[in-house]
Amino acid sequence: MATPVDAMPIEIDQGELQTRYLELGDMAIRHARVPAGSDMSPLLQGLPDDRCQSPHWGIILEGSIHIAHADGSVETTRTGEVYHWPAGHTATTDESVVFIEVGPVEQMRQFNEHVRQVFAAAD
C-alpha cells in the first residue's frame, strides 16, 4: 500500500505546525512540519514524565531539531540524517524542520490522542 504524503490524514493543523498521521499495520507514520522556535514540551504535558513515550525512526527532510532525552542528553538531528529517538524525549527547534517518522502504533497513537485533547482544550 502506498499513500502520497499529502493524502495522509491531518493530525495537527495549528498555523505553521502541521502533522499528518497514518497507521499501517503495527506501525504508524507521521509527516511533520514544525516552525522555528517551537518547544514541544507544552504539548507533552500530561503524558508520563511529560515526554513522548514512543520510539521513533525517521529522516529529517529539511532543517534541524533538538531532542532532549530523559537522561538529560540533547542531540541535534539535521537535514539528510536518519535517526532513532527512544521513548522519553521532547523536542525544540531553532529553525523550521520537516521530517518523517515511523513508530509503533500503540505509542504513536498515545501522542496522537493526547495532542488532540490539548488543542481541543485550548479552543
Locations of regions flagged by a protein language model:
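A short, sequence-level motif marking secondary-structure junctions
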Residues: 35-38, 80-84, 106
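Ligand-binding loop in jelly-roll beta-barrel domains
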Residues: 27, 87-112
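Short, conserved beta-strand element in jelly-roll/cupin
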Residues: 50-67
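Short, surface-exposed charged micro-motifs
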Residues: 20, 57, 90
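Short acidic-glycine-tyrosine-enriched beta hairpin
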Residues: 69-88
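Residues that act as N-cap/strand-start positions at coil-to-secondary-structure junctions
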Residues: 14-16, 51-52, 77, 85
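A short, N-terminal "cap"/entry segment at the start of jelly-roll beta-barrel domains
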Residues: 1-42, 47-49, 116, 121-123
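A short, polar/proline- and glycine-enriched secondary-structure boundary/capping micro-motif
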Residues: 41-43, 78-79, 110-113
